[in-house]
Regions:
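The beta1-alpha1 cofactor-binding region of Rossmann-like NAD(H)/NADP(H)-dependent oxidoreductases
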Residues: 3-4, 24-35, 68
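Rossmann-fold cofactor-recognition segment
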Residues: 13-29
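Conserved NAD(P)H cofactor-binding loop of Rossmann-fold oxidoreductase domains
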Residues: 53-59
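Catalytic loop of short-chain dehydrogenase/reductase
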Residues: 56, 94, 99-125, 130-139, ...
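Substrate-binding pocket helix/loop in short-chain dehydrogenase/reductase
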Residues: 61-63, 70-72
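A short, exposed helix-loop element centered on a Lys and neighboring polar residues
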Residues: 86-87, 131
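C-terminal helical subdomain
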Residues: 139, 146, 154, 163-197
Length: 197
């Protein structure tokens, strides 16, 4: 979420013998997103995997009390940023032998609980977008899916439940293998929302 966080991740990758290219990008600035595809095309020529994981919670409030700017922010990050990312990255994903796209979603999209209007609606829109993109890539080697990882220990979870939730949280490390499985070359799923236990 920050340049410092990216640099710390880069250090971890290098410490285990890997290498990374850092491309800081503010997803709230949609015009900046459009530059990502050409930059990656110039450097790499293709993209094998895109994980759309960024998200914001937005206000947990009655829908009539949520300000327009807050609705716009939630939809900009949770939905429109992913649309723009797919648009700029699509040619690179198609250039891959087996392009993979996975979005992080939530069962909140289907449950639509009270006070979660912005988040629920934005994730519902993302799910529909994922299924549409999957239908458009049906006759390719690409696989487009979404994962609902369940309750994971993240800053967003802390924001949603400041006193701590009444249910057990998974760690990000506990769900990473599920993400790796869905972006693997042998992944059979396409256009699916995979709900983790």
């Amino acid at each position: 979420r920050t340049t410092g966080g990216l640099e710390a991740l880069d250090d971890k990758i290098r410490n285990v013998g890997g290498k990374a290219t850092l491309l800081p990008l503010n997803l709230a600035h949609l015009d900046e997103i459009d530059k990502l595809g050409p930059t990656l095309a110039e450097r790499f020529g293709r993209l094998d995997i895109f994980v759309g994981n960024a998200g914001v919670l937005g206000p947990l409030s009655p829908v009539g009390h949520i300000k327009a700017k807050d609705w716009e922010k939630v939809f900009k990050i949770n939905f429109m940023a992913n649309v723009r990312l797919v648009q700029t990255l699509d040619p690179l994903l198609r250039a891959s032998e087996a392009g993979r796209v996975v979005f992080t979603t939530s069962d909140i999209a289907d449950e639509a609980p009270a006070y979660w209007g912005g988040y629920a609606a934005s994730k519902s829109a993302l799910n529909t977008f994922m299924r549409t993109y999957a239908a458009e890539t049906e006759k390719t080697n690409m696989r487009i899916n979404a994962i609902h990882p369940g309750a994971v220990q993240t800053a967003m979870m802390t924001e949603a439940f400041p006193g701590g939730p009444s249910f057990k949280l998974k760690t990000p490390e506990q769900v990473v293998n599920d993400y790796l499985a869905i972006v693997a070359n042998n992944c059979p799923h396409h256009g699916q929302i995979i709900k983790l236990p």
